[in-house]
Amino acid sequence: MSNVQTSADRVPHDLSHLVFEAGKIGRLKTISWTPVVAGDSFECDMVGAIRLSPLRRGLAVDSRVDIFSFYIPHRHIYGQQWINFMKDGVNASPLPPVTCSSGWDSAAYLGTIPSSTLKVPKFLHQGYLNIYNNYFKPPWSDDLTYANPSNMPSEDYKWGVRVANLKSIWTAPLPPDTRTSENMTTGTSTIDIMGLQAAYAKLHTEQERDYFMTRYRDIMKEFGGHTSYDGDNRPLLLMRSEFWASGYDVDGTDQSSLGQFSGRVQQTFNHKVPRFYVPEHGVIMTLAVTRFPPTHEMEMHYLVGKENLTYTDIACDPALMANLPPREVSLKEFFHSSPDSAKFKIAEGQWYRTQPDRVAFPYNALDGFPFYSALPSTELKDRVLVNTNNYDEIFQSMQLAHWNMQTKFNINVYRHMPTTRDSIMTS
């Protein structure tokens, strides 16, 4: 009888590791990733602290930090190629990598350094894009389809792709193709009442899909069903942690006179993924994004910018609010000196559902606060996404970019795998 080992017990493996990461405001950065195997039981307890780089001014507003863990099966990345790869076994053709740009930081958005020939596995690059396209991009914008990291802008592959601002009336508008009117063709002298009802029903289902059901899984949920992450070919969100980074306010940095002050932000956190059974080979990626609220120095309430107020503007009449179509407004009605030609659409009465932040005039003359100062872009997508460069001026030093994180990933995986001793003692 052969003494060749053909199987292994399911034993725990400690995959704990340290991560020292740095990133920029509003960009989605991979903190860590772990390859997993079919049959694994994966659990993670991430503990650490996030710090903002030294601020030029005292701490004015907290920043929000979001941490996510996703599971992406390799089959979602490689498709039939992966199925054939596993069926062919040792005779399978190798899985080709993707190519990065020059520099050891050309794959930093993936939480890794590229190989000596500037290559990374495709499952990392495409897995990141799948996460962004399914969970972070504006629903009405096109998917990211970079074939290689080398096709990405340098700021994106170094610091991650920009995500949307936190919600406000001007950063979360309706889709650009939203209709503000709908016509129905009728006879010259009569109106088909039944046809009118049918037209209302058609309009309702079209609006539901335009605003709230942009993805197939949303439509199935509306019908009372659901689609699995596998059937929908999307990354599975295992855990999300959200917190506000506040820390402490200011430090005196001049020992002799304490005449110089700078803001300090430090926040400890814990991100825990409960035990997850891995159904097939894949990767678990943990990503983070840090954002300030979209406070703008020049923002005003719509009732100020509109100037000539109608009954519909100010009355907040429930009958009108519930039945009027979406309203097209201009940036000029929200920001002093903005062009009137820059239009976007909001729900009727939205100015009564939100309240703008206010920044007093003396702040405008000072740099160093986490506020938007330049007028918002006239391009809708640029306005929705965080303007990362806006925050460069608020930091005294960017040696560790905008924020830095020191964490330990306490990871335990139960895996069918021989022990190190068994692997050494072959046959």
Curated annotation (Swiss-Prot):
It is found in: Virion. GO terms for biological process: symbiont entry into host cell. One of its GO terms (molecular function) is structural molecule activity. GO terms for cellular component: T=1 icosahedral viral capsid. Pentamerizes and interacts with H protein, G and B pentamers to form 12S pre-assembly complex. By binding with protein D, induces joining of twelve 12S complex to form the procapsid. The procapsid has an external scaffold made of 240 copies of protein D, 60 copies of the internally located B protein, and contains 60 copies of each of the viral structural proteins F and G. Upon genome packaging, interacts with protein J. The mature virion is composed of 60 copies each of the F, G, and J proteins, and 12 copies of the H protein. Assembles to form an icosahedral capsid with a T=1 symmetry, about 30 nm in diameter, and consisting of 60 capsid proteins F. Upon virus binding to host cell, one of the spikes dissociates from the capsid and the virus interacts with LPS through the exposed EF loops on the F proteins. After the genome had been ejected, the channel formed by the F proteins at the unique fivefold axis remains open. This is Capsid protein F. It comes from Escherichia phage G4. The gene is F.
